[in-house]
């Protein structure tokens, strides 16, 4: 099924039908436009973009102009908007609230005269009607909100009404009184006896974001856009709800004045309204310009600034500035001849989803993307739109073949807003036929792939996270530049001189496929890379102009790469870019497990047994080292890099690798720490790894705990993994020295704080020495601090230590402590 009119050949063309077909088409268009107008103006729940409504309206308008006999009194072309809501008191407008005729510019055309042809025609009509060589126009943004009329008697607000159908609207006085931007009493000593002001109620972008955040927090439905939020808020029967919605208002015209002089120009009206206390849009957005060229310049300037404005607009408005000229031009049936709304390229449009694919970002985030039938929206042709994440795709139920509403605002990445379900491709339900009533969607619901589309690594989505990620951090082509940039960082491998530009070009030109390739780079590779990069960017260095080749930077970079071949194990682990593994966690792994070989073999439960490593971090570590592509990349890296400080596992592991501790970290349902201790007292890990379900029934534990344990063990691979964990644990414990042999470190259990500048040690060097001696470095002084090491220009931390009576050391005192003195 398609929307009638889809495929229409152009914005002004009239399709040639036999007369009966023209009558049918006109009736069809009237029915569609009445329905869409009701959804937009009355229900505040539009189902099609504004651009689609405008296109159908203009088709009907062109059809009626070509065939006047088709025009009827209730045609949407003779109306302004929707009917008033029944729940509000109806108000007849003393001066009808007419809408404006629309002009459009085809921003795909390069010739300004062609692009703004409708604008030029408007200016020509105005000049001809006034018999004037040039006309001044007042300009202003076309707000995307809800038009209202405000009536003041003797300076006091007595009535507020919506536009409704232009002749009659709804009285919303109590709600409008809650809008702080609207004056309840006019400024000035002598207000007019009667004043009717018209303007727009709207919601600022920031207030819209706050409102939707509040809606989400309460579990309520969010609003699609600021216009819907403003309209829905103003039409609340309970004005207390309106008061909570942070509505704004801008005045843009005067409808009637009594007992005061009416300014002679529109610009004068705006200046007068400002003195009376009305908010009007900033001066820079409402200049007075001359002729079609001035109008076109204003249009393009505001179009460029649109995304940065604090409110939504969908075009601009031009009005003949002088009131006497407005009166001379008069009105047509539905709009003034002296004003026109110039619509921006639609920010929303209908198109079809041809495919759904996945993009992998530099950090491994996997984003579903809709491949679209090309559509012009927001000033550009859009062929792709983000679907954000799997949850969003399912919430909107976007499928291949769907007709969707696509939105592009400013420089924002195009997104799929919603699906037009009435146009979803359907097929007979399974087991049915073409004549049966049952139908089902032709295309299935979207499912995120389990393997990365770039490298084939496993896709991991952590509990509570909306984003799924590729686990092949070291090997994934999409993540290559980011992975290398992190790897080379100062606190990681500290490869000085290897910046983002060089990394991107090394990857782009194929010199580096992974981190291991850095160590195979030759001087000529770097020089050739830079020559190509400069050429691509149109840069000619001074040395090249002089016929020379600057190579010192490349020699220094090769030296820096070579200097990183024997890093501390903790730095190497941090450099791998494992998700959730920061500097502190990397140090814990290095201190407790000692070697990369052992770390690579550990399952999640063993990682979780280490201090300060929780389940999420443990799972991330295990997933990283279990991924085949990462394993290959790590093998290649370790052929070039050898950690300088590998050592035997920490003797303290003996206290953490007992059966009860490991069982408690396996996340077995119902197996609490207490139950883990009870189970470990009866059976070993090795026994559980080989046990049959019936053997578990003999355990002295509650039946629900035993059943949960049995179900967990029955999952494929669980018993083998448990047996492997037990075997690795036993191997580690067997390698540990006897308890008596384990020498205590000089700063074991001590917390130190560094402040000021030390004579010979940098902050990082001092921290490394303290941690190697078993101590912990904290960033703040407290009663639990054992020592503060103070250098020159020590600040508030020194004063805090003196206040708390904490021992204070200089660098010599620290060295003495490290030596065990």
UniProtKB/Swiss-Prot annotation:
Q: Which cofactor does it need?
A: Mg(2+); Mn(2+)
What keywords is this UniProt entry annotated with? DNA damage, DNA repair, DNA replication, Ligase, Magnesium, Manganese, Metal-binding, NAD, Zinc
Listed under GO biological process in this entry are: DNA repair; DNA replication
- SMART domains in UniProt: BRCT, LIGANc
Q: Where does Zn(2+) bind?
A: 452, 455, 470, 476
User: What does the record give under GO molecular function?
Assistant: DNA ligase (NAD+) activity; metal ion binding
User: What residue stretches are annotated with the BRCT domain?
Assistant: 742-821
Which residues are involved in binding NAD(+)?
Answer: 50-54, 99-100, 140, 163, 200, 319, 343
Q: Which residues form the active site?
A: 142
GO cellular component terms, A-Z: cytosol
Q: Does the keyword Nucleotidyltransferase apply?
A: no
- From the UniProt record, list the coiled-coil ranges: none
Q: Which reaction does it catalyse?
A: NAD(+) + (deoxyribonucleotide)n-3'-hydroxyl + 5'-phospho-(deoxyribonucleotide)m = (deoxyribonucleotide)n+m + AMP + beta-nicotinamide D-nucleotide
EC number(s) in its UniProt entry?
6.5.1.2
Q: Which PROSITE patterns match?
A: BRCT, DNA_LIGASE_N2
Function in brief: DNA ligase that catalyzes the formation of phosphodiester linkages between 5'-phosphoryl and 3'-hydroxyl groups in double-stranded DNA using NAD as a coenzyme and as the energy source for the reaction. It is essential for DNA replication and repair of damaged DNA.
HAMAP family cross-referenced by the UniProt entry: DNA_ligase_A
Q: Which family does it belong to?
A: Belongs to the NAD-dependent DNA ligase family. LigA subfamily.
Name this polypeptide is given: DNA ligase
Organism from which the protein derives: Chromobacterium violaceum (strain ATCC 12472 / DSM 30191 / JCM 1249 / CCUG 213 / NBRC 12614 / NCIMB 9131 / NCTC 9757 / MK)
* Gene designation per UniProt: ligA
């Amino acid at each position: 099924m398609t929307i009638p009119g889809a495929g229409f050949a152009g914005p002004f063309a009239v399709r040639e039908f036999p007369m009966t077909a023209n009558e049918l088409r006109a009736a069809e268009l009237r029915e569609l436009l009445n329905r869409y107008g009701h959804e937009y103006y009355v229900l505040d729940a539009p189902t099609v973009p504004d651009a689609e409504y405008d296109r159908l309206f203009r088709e009907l308008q062109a059809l009626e102009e070509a065939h006047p006999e088709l025009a009827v009194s209730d045609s949407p072309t003779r109306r302004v908007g929707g009917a008033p809501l029944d729940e509000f008191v109806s108000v007849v407008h003393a001066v009808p609230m007419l809408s404006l005729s629309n002009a459009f510019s085809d921003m795909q055309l390069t010739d300004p005269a062609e692009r703004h042809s409708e604008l030029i025609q408007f200016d020509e009509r105005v000049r001809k009607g006034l018999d004037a060589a040039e006309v001044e126009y007042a300009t202003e943004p076309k707000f995307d909100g809800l038009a209202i009329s405000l009536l003041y008697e003797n300076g006091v607000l007595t009535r507020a009404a919506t536009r409704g159908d232009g002749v009659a609207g709804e009285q919303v006085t109590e709600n409008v009184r809650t809008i702080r931007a609207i004056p309840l009493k006019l400024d000035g000593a002598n207000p007019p006896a009667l004043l009717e002001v018209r303007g727009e109620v709207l919601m600022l972008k920031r207030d819209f974001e706050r409102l939707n955040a509040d809606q989400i927090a309460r579990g309520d439905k969010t609003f699609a856009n600021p216009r819907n939020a403003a309209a829905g808020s103003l039409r609340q029967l309970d004005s207390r709800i309106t008061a909570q919605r942070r509505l704004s208002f801008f005045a843009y015209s005067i409808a009637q004045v009594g007992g005061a002089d009416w300014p002679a120009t529109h610009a004068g009206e705006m200046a007068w309204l400002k003195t009376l206390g009305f908010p009007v849009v900033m001066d820079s957005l409402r200049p007075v310009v001359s002729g079609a060229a001035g109008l076109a310049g204003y249009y393009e300037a505001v179009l460029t600034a649109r995304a940065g404005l604090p409110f939504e607009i969908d075009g601009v408005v031009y009005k003949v500035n002088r009131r006497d000229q407005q009166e001379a031009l008069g009105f047509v049936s539905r709009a003034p001849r002296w004003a026109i709304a110039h619509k921006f390229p639609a920010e929303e449009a209908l198109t079809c989803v041809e495919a759904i694919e996945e993009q992998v970002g530099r950090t491994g985030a996997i984003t579903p993307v809709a491949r679209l039938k090309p559509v012009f929206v927001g000033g550009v042709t859009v062929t792709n739109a983000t679907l954000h994440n799997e949850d969003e795709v399912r919430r909107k139920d976007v499928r291949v073949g769907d007709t969707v509403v696509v939105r592009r605002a400013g420089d924002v990445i195009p997104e799929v807003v919603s699906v037009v379900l009435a146009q979803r491709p359907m097929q007979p339900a399974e087991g049915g036929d073409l004549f049966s009533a049952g139908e089902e969607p032709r295309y299935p619901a979207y499912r995120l792939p389990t393997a990365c589309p770039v490298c084939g690594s496993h896709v991991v989505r952590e509990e509570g996270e909306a984003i799924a990620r590729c686990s092949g951090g070291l090997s994934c082509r999409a993540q290559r530049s980011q992975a290398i940039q992190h790897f080379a960082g100062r606190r990681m491998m500290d490869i000085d001189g290897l910046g983002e530009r060089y990394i991107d070009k090394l990857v782009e030109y194929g010199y580096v496929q992974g981190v291991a390739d850095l160590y195979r780079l030759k001087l000529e590779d770097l020089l050739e890379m830079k020559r190509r990069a400069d050429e691509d960017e149109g840069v000619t260095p001074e040395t090249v102009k002089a016929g020379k080749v600057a190579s010192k930077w490349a020699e220094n970079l090769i030296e820096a790469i070579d200097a990183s071949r024997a890093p501390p194990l903790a730095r190497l682990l941090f450099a791998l870019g494992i998700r959730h593994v920061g500097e502190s966690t990397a140090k814990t792994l290095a201190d407790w497990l000692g070697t990369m070989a052992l770390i690579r073999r550990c399952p999640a439960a063993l990682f979780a047994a280490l201090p300060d490593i929780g389940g999420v971090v443990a799972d991330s570590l295990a997933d990283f080292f279990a991924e085949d592509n990462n394993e290959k990349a790590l093998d290649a890296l370790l052929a070039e890099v050898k950690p300088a400080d590998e050592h035997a596992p920490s003797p303290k592991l003996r206290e953490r690798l007992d059966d009860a501790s490991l069982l408690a970290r396996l996340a077995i349902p119902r197996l609490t720490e207490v139950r883990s201790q009870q189970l470990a007292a009866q059976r070993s890990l090795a026994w559980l790894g080989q046990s049959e379900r019936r053997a578990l029934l003999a355990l002295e534990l509650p039946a629900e705990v035993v059943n949960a344990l049995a179900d967990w063990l029955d999952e494929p691979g669980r018993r083998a993994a448990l047996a492997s964990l037990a075997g690795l644990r036993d191997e580690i414990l067997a390698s540990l020295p006897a308890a008596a042999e384990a020498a205590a470190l000089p700063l074991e259990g001590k917390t130190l704080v560094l402040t000021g500048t030390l004579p010979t040690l940098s902050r990082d060097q001092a921290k490394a020495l303290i941690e190697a001696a078993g101590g912990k470095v904290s960033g703040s002084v407290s009663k639990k601090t054992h020592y503060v090491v103070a250098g020159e220009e020590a600040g508030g931390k020194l004063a805090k230590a003196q206040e708390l009576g904490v021992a204070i050391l200089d660098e010599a005192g620290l060295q003495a402590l490290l030596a065990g003195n």
